[in-house]
Amino acid sequence: SQDTFSDRLTIFLTHFAFFLKVYKTEENKKILQEIYDFNFRQMELSIREIGYGDQSINKKMKDYINVFHAILSDIHFWDTMNNEDKINKLSKFFNNYEKIDHLIEYFNDFNNILSKKTLNSFLKSVSNS
């Protein structure tokens, strides 16, 4: 199947959803909001670079934000879901993905890696100070 901007964005949004799921605490609220805002600003710039006009950009951004929040909602209980539930959840966003079980395994690993690190371990290398 064809690799598209939309597919790549869905992959990114899924990673970002896991990132927010793992690190969302009251203590991290402000910095995570800044990261969220930054990511969606960058997405909008990328969509503009592809050549979408202002009206279609607003619709595209709304669509992508809705997809992101749907992913975030669907993975909320990832840690307690069985494999079949995980497949059902991710299949909604990756319906053309042939090896969904590999994707589930990958995101299980990604989730575990994130949960073993602190948010600060990711922020050290990107801070402005």
Residue ranges and their predicted role:
Residues 1-129:
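Surface/interface-facing alpha-helical segments and adjacent flexible terminal/loop regions used
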